[in-house]
């Protein structure tokens, strides 16, 4: 289902530039980029460009998807309006190179085939110069493949599987979230120090690319810390009744329950784990916290829980751009943004900056700018970041969180303490570890 969010088209001096000029390639030196590729230059008018937004607004991942959507919409509104907020990111004027961003939103339902159908419409009907979004890693992988086939840039939304920037990486896809390897390598030493090094762990693993790669990475790095796996229970995506798996976990003798489920599956499995007495007999670790797991499960169950995520709103105390994001998001939406919203917000700004650096919307030029960002990193809501040229994985800090006790919460949304922000460079996988081969620009 598509939701139209057309914006007023406001021209600017930059709107007079001819969209077919490969200015970025000329500025960077080297061979000229193709004058026509994908939806370029057809998708660039004198005063606007179109961006397609894909995310689940129904189904298992609807909470994360709805948050992601609001982050995209806030960034687009700010960029279109111009002024102090986009200027603080380094953007000039209103819009991107003087062009307003038009957009539509598609509900992917968390299903790869639905996501591809929606994105295909954005490309063929709307001449999208960019499409963004996902919550399921499976849909992210499918959208990456579409992007490289149609030669249209794609910014991955929420997707933690190593495969997204590993064996399924694509030249036209970029990921802003840390991958499973990075998150696990950052989290494992923290939980081992806090909980102990000689512990037994039981894993609950959703049976798709995200669950399996998070399991592989977290099992590897906790084993290096001295943990022993006593049980791995695999469950289908969208499971309603976890009793069989949880009964086995309750009887496993484990010290730690590692719950890899995401979205509403994480909420349901955690609540059911409490009914089986697991949370009173074991420590809970969540390698990748869902956007609203805190609120939906409640602080009584989430207190003392360790996990990682992309962003937590109290990081506004650390980074000026994060403070502006949190404040403006709260003003518009009346709740503190979760990390889904942050992904959408941050990556929209990074795309706009990359277009301005390239001097145009030609996707080949924009990709090359993003691939060169190590030498010219972006200042962002989580500090300095860049995309690695070899696999398009963002190198970025990783927050490690611990759930607060209800009595320690300073407000209704103060669910976590940020106990560490791990340097991204220190936890990166070797670029060839997961078999990434990016493919051709053209």
Residue ranges and their predicted role:
Residues 2-12, 24-442:
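Extracytosolic ligand-binding ectodomains
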């Amino acid at each position: 289902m598509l939701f139209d969010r057309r914006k007023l088209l406001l021209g600017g001096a930059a709107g007079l530039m001819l969209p077919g000029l490969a200015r970025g390639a000329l500025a960077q030196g080297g061979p000229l980029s193709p004058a026509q590729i994908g939806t370029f230059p057809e998708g660039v008018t004198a005063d606007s460009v179109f961006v397609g937004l894909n995310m689940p607004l129904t189904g298992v991942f609807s909470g994360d998807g709805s948050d992601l959507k609001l982050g995209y919409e806030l960034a687009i509104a700010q960029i279109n309006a111009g002024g102090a907020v986009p200027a603080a990111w380094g953007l000039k004027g209103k819009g991107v190179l003087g062009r307003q961003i038009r957009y539509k939103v598609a509900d992917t339902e968390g299903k790869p085939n639905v996501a591809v159908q929606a994105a295909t419409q954005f490309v063929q009907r709307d001449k999208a110069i960019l499409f963004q979004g996902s919550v399921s890693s499976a849909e992210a992988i499918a959208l990456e493949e579409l992007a490289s086939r149609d030669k249209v840039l794609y910014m991955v939304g929420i997707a933690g599987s190593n495969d997204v920037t590993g064996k399924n990486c694509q030249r036209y896809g970029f990921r802003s979230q840390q991958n499973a390897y990075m998150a696990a390598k950052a989290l494992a030493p923290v939980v081992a120090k806090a909980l102990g090094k000689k512990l037994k762990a039981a894993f609950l693993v959703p049976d798709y690319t995200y669950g399996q790669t998070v399991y592989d990475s977290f099992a590897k790095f906790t084993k290096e810390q001295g943990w022993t796996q006593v049980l791995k229970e695999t469950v289908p995506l969208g499971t309603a009744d976890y009793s069989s798996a949880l009964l086995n976990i309750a009887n496993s003798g484990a010290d730690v329950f590692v719950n890899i489920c995401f979205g509403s599956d994480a909420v349901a499995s955690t609540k059911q784990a409490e009914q089986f007495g697991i949370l009173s007999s074991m420590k809970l670790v969540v390698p990748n916290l869902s956007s609203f797991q805190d609120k939906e499960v409640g602080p009584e169950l989430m207190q003392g829980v360790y996990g990682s995520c992309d962003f937590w709103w109290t990081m506004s105390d650390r980074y000026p751009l994060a403070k502006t994001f949190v404040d403006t998001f709260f003003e518009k939406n009346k709740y503190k943004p979760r990390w889904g919203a942050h992904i959408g917000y941050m990556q929209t700004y990074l795309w706009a900056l990359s277009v301005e650096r390239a001097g145009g919307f030609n996707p080949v030029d924009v990709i090359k700018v993003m691939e060169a960002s190590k030498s010219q990193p972006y200042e962002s809501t989580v500090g300095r970041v860049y995309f690695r040229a070899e696999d398009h994985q963002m190198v970025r800090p990783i927050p490690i969180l611990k759930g607060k006790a209800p009595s320690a919460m300073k407000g209704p949304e103060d669910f976590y303490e940020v106990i560490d922000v791990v340097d991204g460079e220190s936890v990166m996988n070797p670029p060839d570890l997961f078999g990434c081969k990016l493919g051709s620009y053209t």
